[in-house]
């Protein structure tokens, strides 16, 4: 094998790879073995015609497609390894010369990992991030717990008031016609919750059980459905029942019922401690992000478009998986958000570029600082991931993960070490 390397443009190289005729003929024979059964030549049973007859009957090029694939699969990886080329995408293969008894020559044009020029990455100055737990936040959490533990009972008499729960039947019309999703029976709605569009809920205030009313509202301009966006609608509503929420008193008895604590003060203290921990973790994450951004601002990288496009595709796949867990798909998501695949991808572009840049910088710093993942760290990370799967044989699962996802685990570990290095060497300023 002979390889010539030509720099076409920044981050793009073209390799001209020559495979000697003997090797190519071996690939043709391999192609023949793979495809022999599909050839039907008069005078021979199907799949039994010899190679020389196949070439005469179908032409010598009939076996070239697979032969080319065999040659490329064998020689391309060796060529990029020998020439220290790090591709970020599949190569564009073009045949230069091919034929019986000839050397096989092809070119492989490929986009490569860009050069990263690191600026200052130790000692970057970043503003201190800190949060305080407000008493109001603690009180709001208590109110939320109070709401969750409210007792609900039927309101035998009287009208609907703010805070009541109305059980309703409704049917909606737009342009005088019923529309999909605009009808329900025995629907529970808390008046004042803002669940329904416009002032729908406010128009139910004052109604009694078994009363009906025509409610007029307008859908928001960005409602998410083209047939409803910005359109006025009329709903026929009937009150089936009215319920009242009775909030429990915020006292020691409440604390005993909803927690492991004996007094309300102990519960408040626990809520405050949990909030402090959450805010501390939030501050830490924001500070780390600010450090990485500062390091990124000092670096110079010309990122190939293909790397950004690949990251966008990864982000779309992640979105698709998250939606799947919620019983949705991308089509439904686009309709609900009044968006499209193109709009979502464009929205993701800035984040994708930021992620790619960060990854490249982290990898370069790891190389400069000689930061690597040890075998012990890989085992620990694999075990950590395995525990999340909830399998009985955690050790076996960890072993499988360590083998199948080693590259991803290494990146995760190394990036974590690089982040620690950057944070430890940063300067926190007020």
Curated annotation (Swiss-Prot):
The keyword Cell cycle applies. InterPro entries: PPIase_dom_sf, PPIase_FKBP_dom, Trig_fac, Trigger_fac_C, Trigger_fac_C_sf, Trigger_fac_ribosome-bd_bac, Trigger_fac_ribosome-bd_sf, Trigger_fact/SurA_dom_sf. It is found in: Cytoplasm. GO terms for molecular function: peptidyl-prolyl cis-trans isomerase activity; protein folding chaperone; ribosome binding. Pfam families: FKBP_C, Trigger_C, Trigger_N. It catalyses: [protein]-peptidylproline (omega=180) = [protein]-peptidylproline (omega=0). Keywords: Cell cycle, Cell division, Chaperone, Cytoplasm, Isomerase, Rotamase. GO terms for biological process: 'de novo' cotranslational protein folding; cell division; chaperone-mediated protein folding; protein transport; protein unfolding. Residues 163-248 form the PPIase FKBP-type domain. Its EC number is 5.2.1.8. GO terms for cellular component: cytoplasm. Involved in protein export. Acts as a chaperone by maintaining the newly synthesized protein in an open conformation. Functions as a peptidyl-prolyl cis-trans isomerase. Consists of 3 domains; the N-terminus binds the ribosome, the middle domain has PPIase activity, while the C-terminus has intrinsic chaperone activity on its own. Belongs to the FKBP-type PPIase family. Tig subfamily. This is Trigger factor. It comes from Clostridium botulinum (strain Okra / Type B1). The lineage of its organism: Bacteria, Bacillati, Bacillota, Clostridia, Eubacteriales. The gene is tig.
């Amino acid at each position: 094998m002979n390889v010539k390397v030509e720099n076409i443009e920044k981050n793009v190289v073209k390799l001209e790879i020559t495979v000697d005729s003997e090797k190519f003929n071996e690939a043709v024979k391999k192609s023949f073995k793979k495809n022999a059964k599909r050839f039907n030549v008069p005078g021979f049973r199907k799949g039994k015609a010899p190679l020389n007859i196949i070439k005469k009957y179908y032409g010598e090029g009939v076996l070239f497609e697979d032969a080319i694939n065999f040659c490329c699969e064998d020689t391309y990886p060796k060529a990029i390894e020998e020439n220290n080329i790090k591709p970020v995408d599949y190569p564009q293969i073009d045949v230069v010369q091919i034929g019986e008894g000839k050397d096989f020559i092809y070119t492989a044009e490929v986009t490569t990992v860009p050069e990263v020029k690191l600026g200052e990455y130790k000692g970057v100055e970043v503003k201190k991030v800190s949060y305080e737990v407000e008493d109001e936040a603690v009180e709001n959490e208590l109110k939320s717990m109070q709401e969750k533990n409210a007792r609900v009972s039927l309101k035998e008499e009287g009208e609907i008031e703010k805070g009541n729960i109305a059980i309703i039947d409704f049917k909606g019309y737009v342009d005088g016609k019923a529309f999909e999703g605009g009808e329900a029976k025995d629907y529970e709605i808390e008046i004042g919750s803002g669940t329904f569009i416009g002032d729908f809920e406010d128009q139910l205030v004052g109604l009694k059980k078994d009363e009906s009313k025509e409610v007029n509202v307008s859908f928001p301009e960005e409602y998410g459905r083209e047939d409803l966006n910005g359109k006025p609608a009329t709903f026929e509503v009937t009150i089936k029942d009215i319920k009242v929420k009775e909030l429990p008193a915020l006292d020691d008895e409440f604390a005993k019922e909803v927690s492991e604590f004996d007094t309300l003060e102990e519960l408040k203290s626990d809520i405050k401690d949990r909030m402090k921990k959450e805010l501390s973790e939030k501050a830490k994450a924001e500070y780390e992000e600010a450090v990485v951004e500062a390091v990124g601002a000092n670096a110079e990288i010309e990122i190939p478009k293909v790397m950004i496009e690949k990251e966008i595709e990864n982000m779309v796949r992640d979105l698709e998986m998250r939606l799947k867990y919620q019983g949705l798909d991308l089509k439904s998501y686009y309709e609900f958000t009044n968006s499209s695949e193109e709009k979502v991808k464009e929205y993701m572009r800035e984040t994708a570029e930021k992620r790619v840049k960060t990854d490249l910088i982290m990898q370069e710093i790891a190389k400069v600082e000689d930061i690597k993942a040890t075998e012990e760290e890989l085992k620990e990370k694999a075990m950590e991931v395995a525990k999340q799967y909830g399998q009985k044989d955690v050790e076996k699962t960890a072993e499988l993960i360590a083998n199948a996802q080693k590259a991803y685990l290494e990146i995760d570990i190394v990036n974590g070490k690089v982040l620690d290095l950057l944070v430890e060497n940063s300067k926190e300023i007020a």
